[in-house]
Amino acid sequence: MKPIKALSVASEIFPLIKTGGLADVTGALPGALKPHGITLRTLVPGYPTVIAGIEAALPVHVFPALFGGPARLLAARKGDVELFVLDAPHLYKRPGNPYASPDGRDWPDNAQRFAALARAAAEIGQGLVPAFVPDIVHAHDWQAGLTAAYLRYSDKPAPATVFTVHNLAFQGQFPRELLGTLGLPPSSFGVDGVEYYGAIGYMKAGLQLSDRITTVSPAYALEIQAPEAGMGLDGLLRQRSHHLTGILNGIDEKVWNPATDKRIAATYDVKTLPARGANKAALRERFGLASETDRLLIGVISRLSWQKGLDLLLETLPLLLSEGIQLALLGAGDAALEAAFRQVAQSHPGQIGVVVGYDEDLAHLIQAGADALLVPSRFEPCGLTQLCALRYGAVPVVARVGGLSDTVVDANEMAIAAGVATGVQFSPVTRDMLAAALIKTHGLYSDRTTWQALQQNGMRSDVSWRNPAQHYAQLYRNLLAARSPHLAM
């Protein structure tokens, strides 16, 4: 098996910078691919938290002028993960999150900020760092979408390219007048290049110009080829369907392991499920919920947005309250949803608890202490919280979309009888169907034998990176074989 060098290009990587599941994936993939003979090094922007968190940083290149200022390319690491960091203070040394200011507005120069990331990635791909010349450049989401464009519209030899869609809803569209500023030739602005409805489309560029496309579940790979979920790119995705693959994400079993988790009140495994009770008690105390042990406690860990279906949860709260179900919600996002959930928590203390924001420790406690985890997304490319829920014995209640449908086995009569059910699915994604799913979940919870079977089935599921890594490794080798057969050996 011939060793492969690959460069991952992403705007986030756990544990240095995280706003969502993208960071978890890019953080776990290098370690997952290592047993397959693949050295995956990740290029990320030099945000303040990244610069502060990296180890053994060594400058390997200086860009005298990169979209408005000088920049350094650092070789570094974080634990076992090898990194390149683009240290460009004029682009990345800012408050707020990677994409927006503290008041929630997108940075006005995001086009340049993420073009710089892609430009650096392309140059690394073409041999900028002699000690690490990748066979493959693997870009993630719109922020890295121009990587393939810089490689395509260059006279230098280019490595193979892979582009992964984590969420098609965020596409990175910018005015065509920036084409020259971004260093792209006029010939790139066409339907077979970066042009997208008269603008420069970063996501579109990645989809159009990369050798292979992946997305983060088989179901989502099919859904985005239809107008309902294709976000205007379904035609292109149908055209490139023979180069499109859906590969499920996994979770890091070292980080998400209830038997060793130091962030929870009591550790446990599939054979010691009663020990979960201490976590339920701790979770109730943290959220100010009443301590009746027989009440169903549903957890939610989510961005508060229309996509995530949290408005539907608000509409079904009267049912939840009448059923005596408790709710512990951790999330942030839409200001109106944040205010609405705060209000219902104030109106129903003891039954509804809400923490606005994100807290990794609290997320672990919710997974370990909630009886069920609700994910009512209108669309969900893969989803990671339901994978963690399976691992922790929190029965997932999910919309039948994308990766949720690929990873949760609905507790219908046949699945229960066969001993394979792991959760509850509902479809279509409406208030009434969510309400029906909550009633069904409450009924299953009242049958403790069935409920424990759902928990145990979920905890025995393989939600690790083993299978996904094998699929990515095969994709890499097949791609290299198509370009240079001797590299596939």
Curated annotation (Swiss-Prot):
One of its GO terms (biological process) is glycogen biosynthetic process. InterPro entries: Glyco_trans_1, GS/SS, Starch_synth_cat_dom. CDD domains: GT5_Glycogen_synthase_DULL1-like (cd03791). It is an enzyme of class 2 (transferase). The keyword Glycosyltransferase applies. Synthesizes alpha-1,4-glucan chains using ADP-glucose. HAMAP family: Glycogen_synth. PANTHER family: ALPHA AMYLASE DOMAIN-CONTAINING PROTEIN, GRANULE-BOUND STARCH SYNTHASE 1, CHLOROPLASTIC/AMYLOPLASTIC. Belongs to the glycosyltransferase 1 family. Bacterial/plant glycogen synthase subfamily. This is Glycogen synthase. It comes from Rhodopseudomonas palustris (strain BisA53).
